[in-house]
UniProtKB/Swiss-Prot annotation:
This is Probable cytosol aminopeptidase. GO terms for molecular function: manganese ion binding; metalloaminopeptidase activity. The lineage of its organism: Bacteria, Bacillati, Bacillota, Clostridia, Eubacteriales. The gene is pepA. The active site is at K272, R346. It comes from Clostridium perfringens (strain 13 / Type A). SUPFAM superfamilies: Macro domain-like (SSF52949), Zn-dependent exopeptidases (SSF53187).
Length: 493
């Protein structure tokens, strides 16, 4: 596993020199390197096209053995996300060369700015270096790669800005990878009790309070909907509450992050196929997202009050498990007809949302969940589906997503959709039928938000990947961590 220790420095003896290179204008302040690049361009072996990587091995007596040219395409077309992805690709070349120290020649992209350019580069390197090898018996020796950062046009006044950008990028990468680790843990080791213990350790490390409620305390709170989902498992449910108060002068303003915490989902009596169950350790991707986000927020001491709530349980089959046709209650008081036990996440979320509002006095709600396959069908694997009752709130999320490169898309929430989740024999039913599954699932949760500003994020697509991306590995991706942090961070400026 590669750990990138990124710091501002002058170019010293390193194994490799990493040069970001634009097609039309990159002037390397080294005649030998410029000559080599010009020869490569004449031979059309390297043009600087976006994503292109070429390695030059030094033959002269020099401290730097390898020069890695990283094509960024046209400077007029570059974005922060393109930078992240390009540098994520560069990790593979660094690994191939077995470089233990790399000097990154860094120049600001004018349209993006010094801090944002550097932050995107560091995130690409740090996020792209992630791997999950905990359970492999033949573990490769952990290699620590030091990346020195410098540029010929960075003056002394900009050094502090660079260091702040690096620190923030490394923290966001660290907490995103924390979320990835939580998702990647197998369900036989990551169940409600162990998740709760892990969150306590995380809270101690990053600086937020953690309170855990056991099954008896959950029952006292009248969270029947949440408890019903977990009844089939011998691993008892836990309600995990995280609190960070960074703005004690405005305690009436509390942003609640509510994450779906199904540490395993078999579908219950509405049983999934074997193929559908294989990745269901990832059904707590929403929980991982809010845990990662509050960790970053607390560590940066942002001036904001945040409550994170996770209703953690397993959805399994037993003689005690809930069944299709059951009618159950909820903490808020509404009754629910169960038509499908595999529509369980929303049942845990509604009690968690009610708890956040009534007990933690949340003024705004964001729930995050791997909720519906319909979200993947409609938007693909890379986009988060969003339902909201306040367009301005969604606007904040959208602007934050532009910064992080995590794609979001607002789904319609016309009033008529709400009719699809009304029951003839209870207040609501837990599925809305054949059509608009992502929308009706979100609106089901919306029935419990008590007129608070609310965002519902369905991350069923981006939370877990079965193919490697440029800076996202296979498995848990940590989707949502950086965007939730960025939304909170923008409110503090």
């Amino acid at each position: 596993m590669y750990n990138f220790l990124v710091k501002k420095s002058k170019c010293t003896e390193t194994d490799a020199l990493l040069i970001p290179y634009f097609e039309e204008k990159t002037n390397i302040p080294n005649e030998e390197i410029n000559n080599k690049i010009n020869i490569l361009k004449k031979k059309e072996q390297f043009k600087g096209s976006y994503g292109e990587i070429f390695n030059i091995t030094r033959t002269t007596d020099d401290n730097i053995q390898d020069i890695i040219l990283l094509g960024l395409g046209k400077e007029t077309e570059i974005t922060k996300e393109k930078i992240r992805r390009a540098f994520g690709k560069a990790v593979n070349e660094i690994k191939r060369l077995k470089s233990k120290s790399v000097f990154l020649r860094f120049d600001s992209v004018e349209a993006i700015g010094l801090e944002n350019t550097l932050k995107a580069m560091v995130e690409g390197l740090a996020l792209g270096s992630y791997s999950f090898n905990k359970y492999k018996s033949d573990k490769k020796e952990e290699v620590e790669v030091t990346v020195h950062i410098g540029g010929h046009n960075i003056n002394e006044e900009e050094v502090e800005l660079c260091e702040k950008a690096i620190d923030e990028a490394m923290l966001l990468s660290e907490t995103t990878c924390l979320a990835r680790d939580l998702v990647n843990e197998p369900a036989n080791n990551m169940y409600p009790e162990t998740l709760a213990k892990e969150v306590k350790n995380i809270g101690s490390k990053y600086g937020f309070e953690v309170e855990v409620f056991d099954e008896n305390q959950i029952e006292e709170l009248k969270m029947e909907s949440f408890l019903s989902v977990g009844k089939g498992s011998d691993n008892l449910p836990r309600l995990i509450v995280m609190r960070y108060f960074g703005d004690k002068d405005n305690m009436d303003q509390r942003l609640a992050l509510v994450g779906k915490g199904l540490t395993y989902d078999s579908g219950g009596y509405s049983l999934k196929t074997n193929a559908g169950m294989v990745t269901m350790k990832a059904d707590m991707g929403g929980a991982a997202s809010v845990i990662g986000a509050i960790s970053a927020i607390a560590k940066r001491n942002l001036k904001i009050n945040v409550i994170a709530v996770v209703a953690a349980c397993e959805n399994l089959i037993s003689g005690h498990a809930y069944k299709p046709g059951d009618i159950i209650g909820s903490m808020e008081g509404k009754t629910i007809e169960i038509l499908n036990t595999d529509a369980e996440g929303r049942l845990t979320l509604i009690d968690a949302v009610t708890y956040a509002i009534e007990k933690e006095k949340a003024s705004e709600i964001i729930d995050v969940a791997t909720l519906t396959g319909a979200a993947v069908v409609s938007l693909g694997e890379d986009v988060t589906a969003v339902i909201t009752n306040k367009d301005e709130f969604y606007g904040e999320l959208r602007e934050a997503s532009y910064e992080t490169g995590e794609k979001v898309w607002q789904m319609p929430s016309f009033e008529d959709y709400g009719k699809l989740i009304k029951s003839n024999i209870a207040d609501l039913k837990n599925i809305g039928g054949k059509y608009a599954g992502t929308i009706t699932a979100g609106l089901f949760i919306g029935e419990f938000i008590q007129n608070k500003p609310w965002l519902h994020l369905d991350i069923a697509g981006p939370a877990f990947s079965e193919k490697k991306g440029d800076y996202c590995p296979t498995g848990g991706t940590g989707a949502g961590v950086r965007t939730l942090y960025e939304l909170a961070n923008r409110r503090c400026k």
